[in-house]
Amino acid sequence: MYRTSILAAVISLSTILAAHAQTGLASYYGGRGGGMTCAHRTVPMGTMLTVTTHGGRSIQCRVNDRGPFVRGRIIDVSVSAARALGMTHSGVVAVSVY
């Protein structure tokens, strides 16, 4: 019974997270340091997000800023995160954010 309850909770959480996924464009911002961080307009500060490109590269980054404030963009990532996503040459890439 306990295992069934845990499995049901995990499935429910997965469904909730999938329902809250955003799809759109990501850009990146320069500057020093920051590690794997990002800026999002509404997600609470400190939240860990998974950002996945449509090419299949994926990272986890912590929300530590607000933005982007450019139409069509849903997230700004740090230079380190942009390198990991393979987007430093293009500057903007289509992503899903969970």
Where are these regions (language model features)?
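Secreted/periplasmic proteins
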Residues: 2-98
